[in-house]
């Protein structure tokens, strides 16, 4: 830049610069309305929606498009869990279906390779979607240098790129949170990011954390014959789910040989050449657990550091970027969506936030999200799905409610599948019959929830669900039956 004169030209009320933190060269052909930092489910969806609304959009991503969900989380785990379902059926229930599987061989590496092919296909799909909507993709790490200006440090030795836009959206996601004093080595002591890539299952494993990640990996490895112990500091696994749902899943896990230690905070973990012994606190003192490896599945920490937010005065709390219902921060022109806000760290919630944010930027008409009533899903075996209030939460708020529960074992399709453990529970306002919550545990529970969340959003009474004719035989009939139970009486119970 030496010897050059910095030029500045007004372009549609925005300034765009290239190269350097303090100096730049005007790039008249790249004015942006919106720049999104991060191309995960929140970021890339926000960019696409912004482009659909007529904005010139760009994303900055330092890793793979699709974020953690697509590359290391939601998608590859679901691919592996499909393999786990097949393995479980053949090894524990093959005789019921008439299969003789005495010499069955299972290739875990093949399952992992299959999952990576699916990831590659979907990453390419995101790339094509962004290209289709004329969204520019800049590779590298971004810093918000000032409101309206982003500096991108490329991964190679090329000069930094300075971009400008009226609106900057932070969608940088979150990373695994490890307990204090524990540093994963990626081998004996590891997180989901390492676990999802390794082509050999653990010889034995202790999973610290009984939330969605811990339960899904427990389901996977148990199906491949790995001895699994789940260590949860709270009184029950799946602690954010309805108490009865947690109990049903725990019962199923124990039946399959998974050891559950709940109410057992980890006191110490020692990494050795031969394994990773743990000491956990129990009512009677301490207990020692021997495991070949330890998976840390204790939650997430927002990726809000190193973005320049502190210098700009963006309000944060324990790393979470605080936003209002429009996804706006306290600094005009800076927005935040997805896991980095700490609202509800789920991919589909991030995508919904991204759409709402883009619509609010474009016209101020974006949806206001009721996070408590958004769907939650856990793809363990059995699956869990829920939204809204549990019975205990409703009682704590002084709400008068009615509940109905219908079992999958009274459903013809579930019996035909041979997967009939579990039930659906609906919670409704006692006076108006308005749906306040639903909790499902059982086969394909995660696929059944949208009908119920739509009914809630539309303000429909449970009677409308009961009167909605469901195809027979389908698993979804359990929803209709439970709704009948709330509005006049069960038909098949």
Where are these regions (language model features)?
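FAD-site-proximal beta/loop scaffold in flavoenzymes
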Residues: 186-201, 288-363
